[in-house]
Amino acid sequence: MDKAIGDYLEDLNVDLIVLAGYMKILTKPFTQRFAGKILNIHPSLLPKYPGLDTYQRALENGDSEHGTTVHFVNEEIDGGAIVLQAKVPIFPGDTVEEIELRTREQEYLIYHLVIKWFVEDRLKLIENQAYLDGKQLPPNGYANE
């Protein structure tokens, strides 16, 4: 299936693949084929809480903050070079739904910005490291407090 999708995307000559809520694990051949062209947004401050149920995990662990991460996609689940993160507070008595709403508001802001950087040719993946305007980003990307 990934090969057929990859062939189709290659025929279209895509510059960027934008994932949001895509719950399928991409194969290593697919991620390598489109390395530096796949972005994902994940509802946690990666590398903390890869995978599912991030809001619940943050609540269960008594975290005081949560957030969202935009990253390049590689073969690891929610792996890949981090581009930008946004943090949100977790208040006493918060529910999963409240944290999710707060996080989602930030997702809308930062994903748009990162896609803009990519389209403007300002954002690149070089040797598995994210670069913005020719400068390597820190391991956790930029943090938008």
Language-model segments: which ranges?
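Short, basic/aromatic-enriched C-terminal tail that caps enzymatic domains
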Residues: 127-145
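Donor/substrate-binding cores of folate-linked one-carbon enzymes
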Residues: 16-133
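Glycine/small-residue-rich loop that forms an oxyanion/phosphate-binding "nest" at active or ligand-binding sites
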Residues: 1-15, 19
